[in-house]
C-alpha cells in the first residue's frame, strides 16, 4: 500500500463526484489529474485549511468508477470516429451528473460507464428512435476518466486504514470581551450597546 494522499476540496462536489487538488493548480474530479501528496505535506495542508481533506490514494482508487465529461465530447468528432465494431453507448439526452453524461444501464440510469449498456449496430436505431443519444464505444472510452462518488468516501475509515490521526484544527482564541468597556462610575464591564445607555449597576452615563 502506498503512503500517498489526495487532497479533497470538501467545500463542494461536481454532481455526485468528489473534487481534488489538481496537479499544477485548480481542482478536478479526474483522479488521473489529481495531485498526490506525501503524508507530511497532506497533513500540513489540512492544518492550514481544514476543508482540504487528505485521502489515501489506494482507498479512493478502490472505490473509483468511470465517468465521461460532456465538455470533452463533440458530435463532429464522434461522427468522424472509425467505429469498427459498430457498438455504441446509449446516453440520456440533456441529463448529466455534474458534467458527466448519464447512460442507459442494465438496471436503469447510471453515470458509471462500466454499468452502461453498449448495443451493436442492429439495436442502435431503436434507441435513437426513443430519443437517446448514441456515442461510439471507442470514442467514449478514450475520453473517460476515473472519478469517485463523494458519498462512498468515509474519512474516519480511510484514515484508520493507514494509521493516520489528524491533529485537531487550531481555533482562534475567543475575544468576546474585546468590545467591552468599563463603566466610569463603578468599573463594571459594559457591552457595546450598554455604553450608550446609563450603567445598569450605578446609573452613570458612559456614552461618548
Question: What function would you assign to each model-found segment?
Answer:
Residues 9, 23, 30, 34-38, ...:
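Membrane-topology and secretion signals of cell-surface/extracellular proteins
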Residues 26-53, 106-139, 198:
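A short, charged, amphipathic alpha-helix used as a generic interaction element across diverse proteins
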Residues 90, 173-174, 197-201:
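Compositionally biased, non-globular sequence tracts
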Residues 2-29, 87-112:
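Short aromatic-glycine-(Arg/Gly/Cys) micro-motifs in beta-strand/loop hairpins
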Residues 193-207:
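Cysteine-rich micro-motifs
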Residues 177-183, 195-196:
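Residues immediately within or flanking Cys/His clusters that coordinate Zn2+
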Residues 45-75, 126-174:
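Short, mixed-charge low-complexity intrinsically disordered segments
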Residues 182-188, 200-204:
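Short, cysteine/histidine-rich loop/knuckle motifs that typically chelate Zn2+
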Amino acid at each position: 500500500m502506498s503512503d500517498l494522499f489526495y487532497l479533497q476540496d470538501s467545500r463542494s462536489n461536481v454532481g455526485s463526484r468528489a473534487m481534488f487538488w489538481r496537479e499544477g493548480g485548480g481542482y478536478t474530479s479526474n483522479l488521473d489529474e489529481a495531485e498526490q501528496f506525501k503524508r507530511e505535506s497532506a497533513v500540513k495542508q489540512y492544518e492550514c485549511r481544514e476543508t482540504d481533506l487528505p485521502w489515501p490514494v489506494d482507498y479512493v482508487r478502490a472505490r473509483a468508477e468511470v465517468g465521461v465529461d460532456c465538455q470533452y465530447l463533440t458530435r463532429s468528432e464522434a461522427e468522424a470516429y472509425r467505429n469498427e465494431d459498430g457498438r455504441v453507448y446509449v446516453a440520456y439526452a440533456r441529463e448529466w451528473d455534474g458534467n458527466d453524461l448519464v447512460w442507459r444501464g442494465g438496471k436503469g440510469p447510471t453515470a458509471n460507464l462500466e454499468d452502461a449498456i453498449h448495443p451493436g449496430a442492429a439495436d442502435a436505431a431503436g434507441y435513437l428512435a426513443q430519443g437517446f443519444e448514441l456515442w461510439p464505444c471507442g470514442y467514449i472510452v478514450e475520453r473517460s476518466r476515473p472519478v469517485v462518488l463523494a458519498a462512498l468516501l468515509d474519512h474516519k475509515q480511510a484514515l484508520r486504514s493507514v494509521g493516520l490521526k489528524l491533529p485537531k484544527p487550531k481555533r482562534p482564541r475567543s475575544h468576546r470581551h474585546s468590545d467591552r468597556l468599563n463603566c466610569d462610575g463603578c468599573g463594571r464591564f459594559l457591552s457595546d450597546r450598554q455604553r450608550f445607555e446609563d450603567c445598569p449597576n450605578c446609573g452613570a452615563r458612559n456614552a461618548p
